[in-house]
Amino acid sequence: MEIDSYPEITITDMLAIIRNTCELYMKYGARSSKKVDYFHEEIIKQLRTIFTDERYIVAQEYDVPSLNPSGKKKCDIVVLRDNIPVIVLPVKIIMTNYKQNKNNYFENQIGEVTGIKLANPTINVIPLNIYMSKTPYLNTNKVITKFESITYSDIAIYEKYKEHRLFSDVINYIIDVEHENVVNETYQKIPKLIGFNNATGYVSLRAIMERLNV
C-alpha cells in the first residue's frame, strides 16, 4: 500500500474532534448516536486521504463476515480492498460510568473481534478507544455521585491481545481533563481537555496504517 501525502490529523485536530464529540454528547444525550456518528465521520475522512487508490473503500457500519449465529457483524469503520474487508476499527468513546461497565465493554469487544478473526484470519483489527482521565459516575438522574480515575493499568490488557495477534494494533487514548461540574451536580458541562495522557501519547492514523501490509 502506498501512503499518499495528504495532511494528517494533528494532536490539536484530534483534541478538537474529541471536544466536539463531548459537545454533541451534552447536547443530545447518551442515547443519541450523533456523537458517535460525528466521530466516525471524522476518522473516515482521514482514512480516505490515506487510502486514495480506487481499489480501496472506507465504509461506516459495514457488515463483515463473522463466525457467529448471523454470519456477520456490523462494524463501526471498515477499510475494503477490492471489496474485501482488510481493516476493521471498532470504536468506543467512554463518557461516564466506566468501571461499572469495564468488563462488559471488554468482553463484548473481544467476543466480537474473535468472531471476525475466525471468519477472516488475515484481517487487521485495530480497536480505537477514547477515555477521560477523570470520568464521572452518574446515578439514574444524571447526577455525579463520584469521579473515577482511569489510568493505563485499566487498559493495559489490550496490549496482551496485540501480542497474541488478535489485534494488529491498538489505539487507546486517555485524555487528561478538568471537570467543571462537581459531585452532587447534574453532569451538564463539557470538561476542559488538557491533552493526551503521557501513558497514551498521540500517534497519527497515517503512522499506524503505514505499519500494516494491506
What are these regions (language model features)?
Residues 93-146:
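Catalytic cores of nucleic-acid endonucleases
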